[in-house]
Regions:
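Glycan-processing catalytic domains of CAZymes
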Residues: 1-370
């Protein structure tokens, strides 16, 4: 049977082991604080709105290797064989690395599974802290200059890219860049951005690798900032950036980046498939199809955020998976499909088992790909 690489994004904020997380979540359990205290905000929401769910596994510390051994086994049992860790660099140092370094990479079963990094190079804003999310303020900027990027690249090369469990395409470690506009803005120009990515390729070769597979996270051209962190702008279009910079492929992070998510999932799906087809014909770069579970980031706010995906249970999610499988079979030699997400609880787009659907989303993946 054909092997598919089903890669779920991981939001590494469910731990209190890094001191800087307490800026946003002072209780010391990471963003579980927001999930656990959901009752605090429900009286502020419109009549009829509810968010009644809890994690079946509990409010676990994902920087604990024993927890991650359990999660790895559950993922593999259901067909998820790659984790894409959101990776952050703020104030000249990494942020939220603990879940990867101390959880996943210290788990006994880590080599059964692959992982790669998505550099989440957006600004860190107050939206992660429900107390101040209504007053969006930048705490740390996500853009970096060339010298800072060299520090980042060397960290990737020495700490991650050479690991046997690091996900590679044609022997090249894959790294994804979330906010290409912020990347270009930090470098100062498209030319400098290109120089930085070429430098990374050269350093990888010096380290004995055949290079790096650099992936762009594709956004829409006229995207609303519904996530609260996606505010970067650039003179190029997204497709022009994809073509002019040495990216090897692209994918998406979330439906919210390119379509109206404030409707039923059944209505969203045709637009998602149309976006895949647009990228198939609009670029020679490989597009890896993306499937999101849904969208509702109301847990992060006292006020009501009206972009809410409705009727997005496991059955209709499975329809999206079948469509992505068909696209991968018909178009790509590498059968990689990205999923949002493993654990984005406060955006209500997660595979984690909960008190509403149990293991329903994972079981949908298993039915399609195993």
């Amino acid at each position: 049977m054909k092997q598919y690489d089903i890669a779920a994004y991981v939001w590494p904020a469910y731990t209190g082991k890094e001191d800087r997380t307490r800026i946003f979540w002072p209780e010391g359990i990471g963003e579980w604080q927001t999930v656990k205290n959901i009752a605090d905000i429900l009286p502020c929401k419109p009549s009829g709105y509810s968010w009644d769910r809890k994690p079946l596994w509990g409010y676990v510390d994902e920087a604990d290797p024993y927890v991650m051994e359990m999660e790895i086994e559950a993922a593999l049992d259901h067909g998820v064989n790659v984790f894409i860790y959101d990776w952050y660099w703020y104030d000249n140092r990494p942020f939220l690395e603990n879940c990867l370094n101390d959880g996943f990479l210290k788990a006994k079963h880590r080599d059964k599974m692959k992982f790669y990094l998505m550099w989440a190079n957006h600004d860190a804003r107050t939206l992660w802290d429900r107390r101040t999310s209504h007053q969006p303020t930048t705490i740390w900027e996500g853009k970096v200059n060339f010298a800072q990027f060299q520090t980042i690249g060397r960290r990737w090369l020495t700490q991650y890219f050479g690991l046997p469990c690091y996900y590679k395409i044609d022997g090249k470690p894959v790294v994804s860049i979330y906010d290409v506009a912020n990347f270009i803005n930090g470098m100062g120009s498209v030319e400098e951005a290109r120089r930085a990515l070429c430098w990374l390729q050269e350093e990888a070769v010096k380290a004995g690798l055949p290079g790096v597979h650099i992936q762009m996270v594709k956004w829409g051209e006229n995207m609303l900032n519904l996530s609260g962190v996606d505010g970067s702008s650039m003179q190029l279009s997204q497709l022009e950036a994809l073509e002019q910079l040495p990216f090897d492929s692209c994918t998406h992070y979330q439906y919210v980046h390119f379509t109206d998510v404030n409707r039923d999932y059944e209505e969203i799906l045709p637009d998602v498939i149309a976006e895949w087809q647009k990228l198939k014909t609009g670029t020679e770069k490989t597009y890896f199809p993306h499937v999101s579970v849904g969208w509702d980031n109301n847990p992060r706010f006292f006020g009501f955020m009206d972009a809410v995906t409705r009727n997005n249970g496991p059955k209709v999610f499975e329809k999206a998976l079948w469509a992505a499988k068909t696209y991968a079979d018909e178009n790509n030699q590498i059968p990689l499909i990205t999923i949002n997400s493993w654990n984005e609880w406060t955006e209500t787009s997660y595979l984690d088992p909960d008190t509403v659907y149990g293991y329903g989303y994972m079981e949908a993946i298993k039915r399609v790909f195993l």
